[in-house]
Design a protein with these regions (language model features):
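Membrane-interface helix-loop junction between the first two transmembrane segments
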Residues: 47-66, 226
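Short, strongly hydrophobic alpha-helical membrane anchors
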Residues: 1-30
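N-terminal membrane topogenic signal
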Residues: 27-34, 69-73
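Alpha-helical transmembrane segments of multi-pass membrane proteins
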Residues: 40-53, 84-93
Length: 265
């Protein structure tokens, strides 16, 4: 049976930063080993529990009836932006650098494409989320329908977006972009290999580490928010019968229908 282990380089790094079993090493193990696994467990079990016992709550709680103009502007920006961001993260984290080099994609070309598309997607997500939050705060009926969970979700979501976009933009503006595929990506993969190597994540700049921590907290909160609708798709619509709308059949007989009131003489 495969067991969870912290690799040798991680132990050496922890000793270097905290001195064996000191407070710093304990904090590093909590942040970069315990927190990811706790977040993943809550994410998986929480979604199962939510679907099993709260199917009627598995919804976006749409507020389109209350206001449509801002929603038509902010919602597409946010959803298309966050989709591109998610695909970019999946590709950048799960696909190792050795694979892209083997298929002929140079580091310069990969970095240019990742930064350009990532920045565009990030700003679309940020602008869309800002519009949706502004709408939720300023439109009375929408604000009244906003729950405490919604507010926590928006705080965590915006923190994760801002930290991620900030590390990307600031790193390139200063002329010192950081290649996260050398540290953050292999650390993330090591978590799923059940051999978390904290030495890798500790080499990353503080901005990347804060972004990662914010993401883990968001994932842990995900099952208890309206974000569960990400895993819903109206597949039943493809096979269900058409809904046919018909006007009322004309009344049979030659007698004209009587009115429901009589004139007072």
């Amino acid at each position: 049976m495969t067991g969870l282990a912290i690799t040798g380089p991680a132990i050496s790094s922890l000793r270097a930063t905290g001195g064996g079993g000191g407070p710093s090493s304990a904090v590093n193990v909590i942040l970069w080993v315990a927190v990811p696994y706790i977040s993943i467990a809550i994410f998986v079990v929480g979604h199962y529990w939510r679907y099993r016992y709260d199917k009627f709550g598995w919804t976006t709680r749409s507020s389109q009836l209350y206001e449509g103009r801002l929603l038509r502007l902010g919602s597409p920006l946010f959803h298309f932006g966050i989709l591109l961001v998610a695909l970019g993260h999946i590709g950048g984290i799960l696909i190792p650098e050795s694979f892209t080099s083997a298929i002929g994609i140079s580091e310069t070309a990969y970095h240019a494409a990742a930064v350009t598309l990532g920045t565009i997607a990030g700003f679309c997500t940020l602008i869309g989320a800002t519009i949706l939050i502004y709408r939720r705060r300023t439109v009375g009926p929408v604000f009244s329908a906003t729950t405490r969970n919604d507010k926590i979700m928006y705080v965590l979501l915006m923190a994760t977006i801002l930290l991620g976009l900030g590390t990307t933009v600031l790193g390139n503006l200063t002329g010192h972009p950081y290649d996260y595929r050398l540290t953050v990506a292999p650390w993330f993969r090591s978590i799923f290999y059940l051999h978390p190597d904290t030495a890798l994540i500790l080499k990353a700049p503080i901005g990347f580490r804060l972004h990662v921590l914010a993401a883990w907290v968001l994932f842990a909160f995900w099952p208890f928010s309206r974000l569960v609708h990400v895993f819903s798709a109206p597949l039943g619509y493809l096979t269900r019968p058409y809904i046919v709308y018909r006007s009322r059949d004309p009344q049979l007989g030659s007698r004209a229908p009587r009115r429901g009131w009589e004139r007072v003489q």
